[in-house]
Regions:
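N-terminal glycine-rich FAD/FM-binding segment characteristic of electron-transfer flavoproteins
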Residues: 1-181
Length: 181
């Protein structure tokens, strides 16, 4: 099992087309901000393309602390192999504990490939995201002066809970990947 203490931060794969960010990017960055606040870490956008550095600053207004920009003429338009390689290389180098990818056509192509290459889980069509902090509830009740952003927790307890519809939408399933980040 990996040392989860190496993993830090919530990342969002930011999708652009013809040099413009997609609306899902802003939604995901806002959701990432909530998760990062709970984890006490930063939100990082990952933006791939060609001549896209100028649009990266737009993500800050939605909660991104920083944006990593990977520019190349080869990344101007989405291609599965190129984008999967760059995303996986960046994740392996920087080790975010959460990576969010939108449920767009590109996201549905890229997400499973990255999950397989990174040997981690993937939940498609999640409708709710949360951090499993159950072990800390009693601790927090005992002390109302605790600033969560300054606390160090056992990383194995910081699981992302992903909720999605199951069985034709008649049931909601909550999924965690406790052995992977």
């Amino acid at each position: 099992m990996a040392d989860f203490n190496e993993y830090k931060g919530v990342w969002v794969f930011c999708e652009q087309r013809q040099g413009a960010l997609m609306s899902t990017d802003f939604e995901l960055v806002s959701e990432a901000r909530k998760l990062a606040d709970e984890l006490g870490c930063e939100v990082t956008g990952l933006l791939l393309g060609d001549n896209v550095e100028g649009i990266a600053k737009e993500l800050g207004g939605y909660g991104a602390d920083k944006v990593l920009v990977c520019e190349s003429p080869l990344l101007k338009d989405y291609t599965t192999d190129a984008y999967a390689k760059v995303v996986c290389d960046m994740v392996n180098e920087y080790k975010p504990e959460v990576l969010l990818i939108g449920a767009t056509n590109i996201g549905r192509d890229l997400g499973p490939r990255c999950a397989a290459r990174l040997h981690t889980g993937l939940t498609a069509d999640a409708t709710h995201l949360d951090i499993d902090t159950a072990k800390y509830i009693d601790f927090l009740k005992e002390s109302s002066t605790i600033d969560l952003s300054k606390q160090k927790f056992d990383m194995e307890d910081r699981n992302l809970k992903m909720t999605r519809p199951a069985f034709g939408g008649h049931l909601m399933a909550t999924i965690i990947c406790p052995r992977f980040r």
